[in-house]
């Protein structure tokens, strides 16, 4: 099968590349039910249970595949290291330092580039679907000039709408192009009202993409403090609950931000979160 992969910017310019914290994996049969329940709780039981079960049951094999593809998760001679993130009762998050998305995506991109049957067109904008008699025949795209790509199968993997927000950790070009095209062509969409808001980013007044402060920072012990330097929530609740708690505290404090205290982290911060540490140093913040 011949595949044509187009991407709006460069291959690495995806939100997956920006992910820091890690990837959750089932820790054996004894963890299965807990993992499923944690996921259902975080989704307020609106999840598709079958999809959750598939996610959990296939997680170990998926991680093995990533390792075979060259992803080097953090660990030592004794085995891989696990951290904890919001909504998880156990340490079941594998990670690559604090740039997990970068390392996973680079391994996947390397594999894609090795495939002779995959043609890649970067800096190419998807414009619309080609529809005839209620069938999708391909797409219309723009790469300097407008052109069409005919195909038997068309997969829209264009991401969400994070780029349209004023304050976002997403790339600005991630603006829901695929979702918009699907709506125009009456393609069924599901749960598009759900937009995941990450609770913690570095506060800045500019309009640039905000720097993500990984959830695993809280998983390793960092705590949220208000303007009186008082802890006000459980930092490892699901993301929507932590985000809501921060917003409510900001309203009480009449503040545009709250504090994330690194002093409660017992690990070597510079070693565990090297990229976050470097980026904060650039912003004149030393968390050591």
Task: Please provide the spans of the model-predicted regions.
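Glycine-rich FAD pyrophosphate-binding loop
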Residues: 2-23, 27
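Flavin (primarily FAD) binding-site architecture
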Residues: 156-170
